[in-house]
């Protein structure tokens, strides 16, 4: 199976970890079309109906932080399974539903969520995706 960084951190540190998710309804993103491909500025499609991102968009707020402590109404409300979009270093809008959406109970996945309704792509500091010689930085999970 696949594990995300949040699952690994929660497994290692339990309730000492605070997991924060990020969502967006639309905008632009810097991502590649395939592993090892060059970074591109891509338009992010509007979120699918009945997704977490669509629900947050319907609030009419441009951006917000949603805290979900154990006894909060938000945590209870977000127990319902919803589609959630994951955009990382790869973004494939042409297969977005299959490539980037999954079913989740958001309040089981995160302790808080930052929603930015419309994002703007970041510009890469280094405009190449080629490997460079040298030792790879440790990133699992202690090196994060």
What are the roles of these predicted feature ranges?
Residues 1-144:
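C-terminal regions of proteins
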């Amino acid at each position: 199976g696949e594990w995300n960084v949040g699952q690994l951190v929660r497994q290692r540190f339990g309730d000492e970890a605070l997991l924060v998710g990020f969502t967006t309804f639309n905008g632009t993103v810097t991502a590649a079309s395939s592993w090892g491909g060059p970074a591109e500025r891509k338009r992010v499609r509007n979120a699918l109906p009945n997704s977490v991102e669509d629900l947050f968009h319907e609030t009419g707020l441009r951006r917000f932080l949603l805290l979900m402590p154990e006894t909060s109404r938000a945590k209870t409300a977000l127990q319902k399974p919803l589609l959630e979009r994951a955009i990382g270093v790869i973004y494939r809008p042409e297969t977005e539903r299959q490539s980037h959406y999954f079913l989740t109970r958001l309040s089981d996945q995160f302790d808080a969520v930052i929603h930015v309704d419309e994002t703007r792509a970041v510009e890469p500091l280094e405009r190449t995706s080629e490997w460079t010689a040298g030792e790879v930085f440790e990133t699992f999970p202690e090196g994060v």
